[in-house]
Amino acid sequence: MDRNTLFSILLNNFGFTPTEGQAKVLYHLSAFILTEKERPLYLLRGYAGTGKTTLVSTLVKTLPQIGMRYQLLAPTGRAAKVMSSYTGKPASTLHRKLYRFQAVANGELRMTRDVNKHKNTVFIVDECSMISDQGDGYSWSRSLLDDLIEYVFSGSCCKLLLIGDSAQLPPVGLDISPAMDFDILRNSFNLTIATYEMKEVMRQALESGILHNATEIRNKIAMSNEQWAMSDFDGYELPLLNINNFDDIIKIDPMSFEELLWQSFGDKRSNNDAVVICRSNKRANMFNQAIRSRVLQEEGELSAGDKLMVVKNNYFWTSQQDNETTRQQVAETQRRRVAESQSTINNPFQSPSPFQSPSPIPNISFIANGDMIEIMKINKFEELYGFHFADVEIQLMDYEDAPSLSVKILLETLHSDSPALTNDEAKRLYQAVEEDYMDIPKASDRRKAMKENPYFNALQVKYGYALTCHKTQGGQWNNVFVEAPYLPEETILELGDLRWLYTAITRASEKVYLVNFKDEWFM
């Protein structure tokens, strides 16, 4: 097949007349898919509303038609769920795809990068602005970006498509998003690389107040980047936002705010379609307490039905737990999918492509930072080692068919103003647990035994109703309440403020409610 033929297939599958930028990307993709060069990577950057998701859906539809496979990946479970929603196909998190447990000589399970057994496969990764090139302290990982690239290109005839928006917040602790930076990718990895940035927002998208304001902020970020590079950026002065004649981005007063919180969070069965985005963990704690006490009318620290976010990767509960319920649920899911597959085979009008990537049973090898969970049942509360714990049954909310798990959670992080346990708190817990193992004389044996302690491995969580902007990144909610960012100088916005606000308002699919924004913000 030649490039022009594939381009025609892509255009036909696109379904309507593409914008100039979309047409260019489709033409680039036709070359990218067919290239036989070593380690091919295509970096697709784009503003919100430029149609990146439509392009991905078109590619996913086209690849099986030409005998190629694909894998859909994203940094978090929420981002993978969004990707699966707009493509109609299963998507996985990067961590669940890249890593696995491996037994080492002493019988201990250790995390390691998995082997890429895929052939002739395009790995499509969304929300790449979240991917860091910094190590996270684990000996088995250089960095998520390193591991992703080396995993993909260790397979036979595999290609990598990175998609994202460079205007969003970079990974915590970084000034830029390395996976969105052409020069970093080109200089740090041995790649055949091409890139394109989509800037033309679709006309119908600009009818949305959310995307209208996002585009204006995005343009100011681009301008600020140029000035910052020349050391000529002193901040951007308010006003910034235009909410006139739009019904999807609204400034609200305190009374309306409380009423809208009731509407959004009052029913535990459906309150996972809204989020409050805050400027700090301290502010998120305040909003979470208010929502639980005044809206949900919860008096206890934890209740069945509570939605929580995991704030630190946890490898203990899924690797150590001999969970018969889990095995039965996975087996039942497998039987159901086999039955569905047989039904499809027997129906000539539903013949699937032999090249379509299969819908995988969820990989529950660990519980990831950023995973949303729901408390299904509370078995007991207890206090030990100077900390408070709860034994609970949880459901992973962002993974279809994921089995329930029995875990122990640490309650201190629910109210902490830090992202997770502080270093001092973690040290205090470690030392308290270690006291129970001092009869083991050898330090290495003692540490190994401590790794099996359920209290030491308790899941660190926060309430999931109000979150910091970084914690919402990659996710999407119907209704998003955005608290005004803190400005030391009341009318001057730094580049980071622009990125923060851009990321926050683009989390909404239907409505943005602006909370505590002064009149100076508005045109």
Regions found by a protein language model. Give the residues of each.
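Short, conserved phosphate/pyrophosphate- and ester-handling motifs at nucleotide-, phospho-/glycolipid
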Residues: 22, 76, 280, 474
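C-terminal accessory regions
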Residues: 369-371, 375-376, 383-523
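Short polybasic linear motifs
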Residues: 223-230, 324-327, 332-344
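Intrinsically disordered, low-complexity proline-rich tandem-repeat tracts
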Residues: 137, 326, 342-348, 352-360
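ASCE P-loop NTPase helicase motor core
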Residues: 26-27, 31, 36-225
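Conserved helicase motor core of P-loop NTPases
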Residues: 3-6, 29, 37, 153-158, ...
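Conserved pre-motif I regulatory segment
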Residues: 2-40
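Conserved SAM-binding loop
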Residues: 18, 72, 276
